[in-house]
Amino acid sequence: MKDQELTSMKLDVLREIGNIGAGNATTALSVMLNSGLRVEVPVVKVLKFDEIADMIGGPDTVVAAVLTHFTGEVSGMTLFVLELEEAKNLAGTMLNKTYGDDFTTFDHMDKSALKEIGNILMSSYISSISTLTNLKLSIAPPAICVDMAGSVLSLPISELGQIGDKALIIDSKFLDNE
């Protein structure tokens, strides 16, 4: 993101677009998991790249992340990041399996389930943004990575670093209704 100021009004518009996108993504995920979910109102902010890892627990925190590029009239990427415990719970719900306390790694099926969840969420999100803004956007197949947050962020930061030193963050929190 280029070094430019976003006005309060622009942030409000982005928050509303994020809210609608997150709502549609929540509906899609609820149907997929046959579970009631809700979403908190998204927090929209512009962060320097070195601040993003701290937002998700610090550079040494192990996370699961699904990355998707989108192209069209504008281009960019989305990153769906989960703490390891959240990722374990989501994969377990989708695959109807439980993980022991000694859990240390995801197998191929676990990663596939998380990648599919991320794909559905981000496709719903990007589709909503496309509809609301009348921008033609298409989404590429997702990639998944389970690693330390600093490592997970290295690819997006290296790509985005060519055009700026900040990223627009729409932080959506999905919560179980139970």
Model-predicted segments: where are they?
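Composition-driven recognition of glycine/serine/threonine/acidic- and proline-rich low-complexity segments
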Residues: 2-178
